[in-house]
A protein has these predicted regions:
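Short, conserved, GDST-rich strand-edge loop motifs in beta-rich repeat architectures
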Residues: 82-101, 202-225, 384-393
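Beta-propeller blade termini
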Residues: 63-73, 110, 131-146, 160, ...
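Hydrophobic beta-strand segments that make up the repeating blades of beta-propeller
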Residues: 79-83, 143-152, 198-202, 268, ...
Length: 559
């Protein structure tokens, strides 16, 4: 059963969270957030595979992610979903006796613009022979078409978008070489040269032959394997990359990476990197503005949990959750989810337990997660997907509605049967796939059919979505990267300011739609929009109509 609804106060000085009645008993706090299962109606017939007869290793239990990205530039976010594939007996103790034909693989679903999708995987050339885990999207060559980086066991693959509906594997040509188990990645322009660089997170030195007698079902955990170093590749702005792992200082740290995201947490104009590790201290790499990073997680208060122990971190999200104008950090976890309030002093205060958010999910294992205004009331909400860790134990999922001033309420039981339906969730990605102004979600379920959750909330407020287009192209060599990754956007409406930074990856093994979504509540228009581009340019727009997708071009910004 779900816990009673919480009033969650995101200030450490306020003390323990106080229980309040269920939302349906409190009219002024009644939630309108609702989701419906739209999987069948949308035509997304995807089933994930972990490649064996039963879960028998860390590799099989990790799961896979997804990404929303507009690969054909028609204004409708398309969906790429990852899967494991059939494992040979050398990689599993429980091989399939009758492997499926064809083998399980990734799928690309083209958005038809009417709420339905068409599987175009083979046409696009996006069916690799890979046990895939995570995916991120970025226009690495600034040609106007979004490319893909797929990570998995044994290698990572860089797909170039050819602009005609097809993709080409350019991994070797681009100089991307990642061995071992690359589990996640993110894109960032760490040197602000207008070309996005690539960070690849690696998990452990997985050995399928190793068995731990003391492990449950002879299933070794992350600490039974050696950790790995992550990789940082500098974009040379010519379609190739250079491995700068050691030069940047990233290579000095060995972890067990699960999730990674990058954003300018300290507001100095340069993107930093947060690495969520499993059973190992987390990393926060602060950008030193000279091509190198310093690891400050301990000093910043994000290396360990409140008990001083390493956490089982999964999916990190940077967002201004407490409304302070600074980027806070939300991390899903196998035990206690963590909400870390940015203290404005190059650090964070862990308020997850004090707020009650951590306890609300303590009985679950949390994986995919997103921080969005699901009801467009001008306040950020949090959605979390759960599932068993080492067994296929399905769990229900969670929705926390933002109430303002750092307070949240658990409204999961009122959010629709698709939220309370138990699955073994892993990666999740978020987008307004039908362009109705409400954020939807897609979740990959381990070894089972995936779920498309359509946001059908009623009585919602106004909204605006912003698509950024940096000035740099494959012919123009000045300005910000084409995707606007690293840009920070302020939206002012009805006297309130909201801040969102354009990031690449977010949550667990996944990436959300690149358009920045702002719920506006009753505001009849947007008073002001300010874009702080990575190039240093600042662009202001005033008196903008709401309830639409707005494209902002850096080429129109003052020089």
């Amino acid at each position: 059963m779900k816990p009673q609804l919480f009033l969650i106060v995101a200030l450490a000085s306020t003390g323990a969270a106080q229980p309040i009645p269920h939302a349906s008993q409190t009219p002024q706090q009644k939630s309108t957030i609702r989701f419906e299962d739209a999987t069948a109606k949308a035509g997304v017939a995807f089933t994930h595979s972990f490649g064996s007869a039963k879960l028998s290793s860390l590799l099989e239990g990790t799961g896979s992610g997804c990404v929303w990205f507009d690969y054909n530039n028609d204004g409708n976010p398309d969906l790429y979903v990852l899967s494991g594939t059939t494992l040979p007996a050398s990689l599993t103790t429980s091989p399939l006796q009758t492997p499926p034909t064809p083998p399980p693989h990734n799928h690309l679903y083209r958005n038809n613009g009417d709420g339905t999708f068409t599987d175009v995987t083979d046409m696009a050339g996006l069916r690799p022979d890979l046990y895939a885990t995570a995916v991120t999207a970025a226009d690495y060559d600034n040609d106007g078409f979004v490319d893909l980086l797929v990570t998995g066991y044994g290698r990572a693959i860089l797909y170039h978008n050819n602009g005609d509906g097809t993709f080409t594997d350019v991994t070797a040509k681009a100089g991307i070489k990642v061995d071992g188990w690359s589990i996640s990645s993110t894109w960032l322009d760490y040197d602000r040269d207008g070309c996005v660089d690539l960070f690849v997170g690696r998990y452990v030195k997985f050995d399928p032959k190793y068995r731990n007698y003391y492990a449950a079902d002879n299933y070794p955990g992350p600490l039974d394997y050696e950790g790995e170093t992550n990789r940082l590749f500098h974009n040379n702005c010519d379609g190739t990359f250079t491995d700068v792992t050691d030069k940047s200082g990233i290579g000095a740290y060995i972890g067990r990476t699960m999730g990674v995201t990058a954003a300018d947490f300290d507001g100095d104009g340069w993107p930093d990197i947060y690495v969520a590790n499993d059973k190992t201290e987390n990393f926060l790499f602060r950008n030193k503005h000279d091509g190198s990073f310093e690891e400050i997680a301990g000093d910043a208060g994000v290396a360990y949990g409140q008990d001083g122990e390493a956490t089982s971190s999964m999916g990190p999200v940077f967002a201004d959750i407490t409304g302070s104008g600074l980027l806070d950090l939300w991390v899903s976890d196998a035990h206690y989810n963590r909400l870390m309030k940015n203290n404005g002093k190059a650090g964070f205060d862990d308020i997850g337990i004090v707020s009650g958010l951590s306890q609300a999910n303590a009985q679950y294992v949390s994986w995919g997660t997103g921080v969005y205004d699901l009801d467009n009331d001008g306040l950020l909400d949090i959605m979390v997907f759960h599932g068993g860790l080492i067994h296929l134990i399905p769990q229900e999922h969670s929705v926390f509605r933002g109430l303002g001033q750092g307070q949240f309420a658990d409204v999961s039981r009122d959010a629709g049967s698709v939220v309370s339906t138990r699955t073994v969730a892993r990666g999740a990605c978020f987008a307004d796939y039908d362009n109705d102004g409400k954020i939807d979600a897609f979740v990959v379920n381990l070894g089972a059919p995936a779920t498309l959750l359509h946001n059908v909330s009623t009585g919602t407020g106004h909204w605006i979505a912003i698509r950024l287009a940096g000035a740099r192209t494959n012919t123009s060599k000045s300005g910000s990267n084409r995707d606007g990754i690293g840009a920070r956007v302020e939206v002012w409406a009805a006297g309130k300011r909201q801040i969102v930074e354009r990031v690449a990856s977010s949550g667990y093994l996944s990436q959300d739609d690149s358009r920045l979504h702002f719920g506006l509540g009753p505001a009849v228009k947007v008073d002001k929009i300010v874009v702080h581009w990575p190039s240093g340019r600042e662009q202001t727009l005033t008196d903008q109509p709401n309830d639409r997708v707005l494209t902002i071009q850096e080429t129109e910004a003052p020089k």
